[in-house]
């Protein structure tokens, strides 16, 4: 999916939570879509021969991951027992990608339950 499609989906989800801010599935979808956008962006921006990102391109990916993290952390507060959504694994992926080992380990423990 190209960046424009990710952004269209995210905008639609954000409109939905303006109507119902407690709709956990939509909040989950925003977090997942942003996470997918970050992965796609990383693949798109990576140097084709080395697979590495420039500092500026890396920051673009980090910014999207941080936005995704915000939605998933909000969801963690709203649905702490993961009764409506399984937020632990995508949040683990984000913490891992951002290098937050302590929080990644915390999520990994939740995944073992």
Predicted features along the sequence, with ranges:
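Residue-level recognition of tetratricopeptide repeat
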Residues: 23, 82-84
